[in-house]
Amino acid sequence: MGIQREEHIDLSAPQILQAMAEEDRPLLLREILHRLGLQKERRQEAREFLRDLAEGGKIVRIRGNRYGLPSKMNLIVGKVKTHPDGYGFVIPEAEGEEDIFISPRNLKEAMHGDRVVARVESIRRKGKEGSVIRILERKTRKVVGKFMRAKNYSYVTPEDERILQEVFISEGETKRARPNQIVVAEITRYPTGRARPEGRITHILGYPDDPEIEPQIIIHKYDLPHRFTSAALKEAQNLPSTPPADEYKGRVDLRGIPTFTIDGENARDFDDAVSIERDKDGGVKLYVSISDVSHYVKEETALDNEAYSRGTSVYFPDRAIPMFPTELSNEICCLHPRVDRLTLTAELRYERNGQRKGVQFYPSVIRSDERLTYTLVREILLEEDAELKRKFEYLLPSLELMAELCQELRRRRTERGAIDFDLPEPEVILNLQGETEDVIRAERNLAHQMIEEFMIAANEAVAHFMEDKGFPFIYRIHEPPKKEAVDEFRRFISNLGYKSMRPDHGLKRVADHSPKEFLRVLSEVKGRPEERVINEILLRSMKWAKYSAKNLGHFGLASDGYTHFTSPIRRYPDLIVHRLLKQVLSEKEVKISDEGLGNKADHLSERERVAMEAEREILNRYRVRFMRDKIGEEFEGIVSGVTAFGFFVELKDVFVEGLVRVTSLHDDYYQYHEKKYCLIGERTHKTFRIGDEIRVRVDRVDVERRHIDFGIVEKIGKGKGDAGTGVTG
């Protein structure tokens, strides 16, 4: 970088980072000024930039007031992920960096979730080891846990085992909590080398036995916004109950076309409706009409800011934490039957064989004819219920044509390699007291597939349209899995006896692999007892899908362009997509940059991940509660994971996972064979590996820690991998 002595040079973060990138050592402030061609009068301005960059982890300040890039000083910026046993890892923010193991001693004062700077101290066979040298940002601001009293003090034992320290509560900050109650403690002082964290009680949730506290635990543990600001509520209450007629101007009127919604029985917010017509040339015209939320929610309003903060709606078995107040999500933006609603429509035209031949997007007005459910559509189309077919006779041609188009779209997606995990999902049934009454397999039928195919088609069409226009946009991306993850999964699946991913069946180099390779695995395991377990393991080997301002394609869908357009009531990215699409359609200037969209994409990806983890955990909590009165009962299950200390078994139908500890296997001494992913008895050579069918007995259920211990009754069947291994079971 040439040195220019010009006072009018604009100072920027990229300039500073570029100057540091060109040096092999950390720089003093005066050296940075010199390299940027700035006089010492700009010192304060530069110092503020450096402080902001250091706080953001882009640069690191070291002894002697020198500044440098972390990558040039063997330093890593990342997030701490701790383990209940006391150690942890730093997950680097930089793409492609491997995780760093941190021993308990080297975690120092860092807590789970903190954003830190770590130094790599050594590189061993199993990977990098290091230590935390600086905490950039504290993630944990409050702790949910059990309130306890000792002789002279009180404390909270965190409910999350990854928070390794108890939180000390001074006498005046207990809010009169009683021992063993579940409370929320706000941290007032973070741990130091000599002292535990300190806090004050802000909420008393109740006793652990009360099922009603489960949603409250999750809300506070994941810090889910669950109360709307008064300003947001006021804006929602001021919305009209029906759209005024003058707002129909400039919209395509689709009220004459049979239109309906298809959702679950318990759904309340209907934001997508579908219609279909035969084209004159024998093809079909599919209309996917999405609630025009952006018409009512303007940028930078209280409603908009609240929705952006939440990012997404969160769904529990007994309630939802919506992104918008009910006046909007269940009323003016909800596509109720037999009322006019404003929508944004994707009109997709297809040949008879499912080949898309054209697309149009436009603001529209619709009137849904019916609120159908997945069950109703299944009974009409698959079970041919005569009474229902008579009742919905006027919609029957549309439903039959949709089923036909769905099969063609699905066939085409499969041919291009789209991965359909089709995992059975658990559905928790609660009684009036909030206790788990049953855990059942959620239904997935032709009606689900129809809506799924149509929404995917609309999302892809919007992404391709916007990319062709060349404007800034927000995409839904799913990057290919890492080579290491592919290699590990290949070894695992081959060890189980499956041939799909052996080197002679493709995947010789990671660059060769495509979704089709994984699709072959799913086809090979289909119908086998271990199908669900292998699907889960394959899913875990994939990267997370996320939002991005760069179109990197969607690996799982085998799509070169994808976005989220179809759910603006419950996903904020869809609302952004609607706004951008409408700006392009109206030929207005798109006023946001790629960088601005990138920042929004990062925030919304994080909010989605928090919501998914919260939803997953509350399901797990209810499933464990379901098992607590099943002590001594026997169930059939599948070995879902094997470790040195035992193996995990997932029960069939109820989707509950528990541990058979190796110490409970008294018939032999079992050793873990890491390369074979199994436990083998020294004397009997009996094996336990993933996919084995097992009958187990429920021995212990710890509701608070969500741990279940099983005892083995018998091994029912061998997994595929036992064949030809020379090991008897």
Residue positions per predicted region:
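Charge-lined substrate channels and their catalytic hotspots, especially those that engage the 3′ end
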Residues: 1-287, 294-340, 378, 678-679, ...
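Electropositive polyanion-binding surfaces
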Residues: 184, 190-191, 217-224, 231-666, ...
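Classical nucleotidyltransferase
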Residues: 663-670, 683
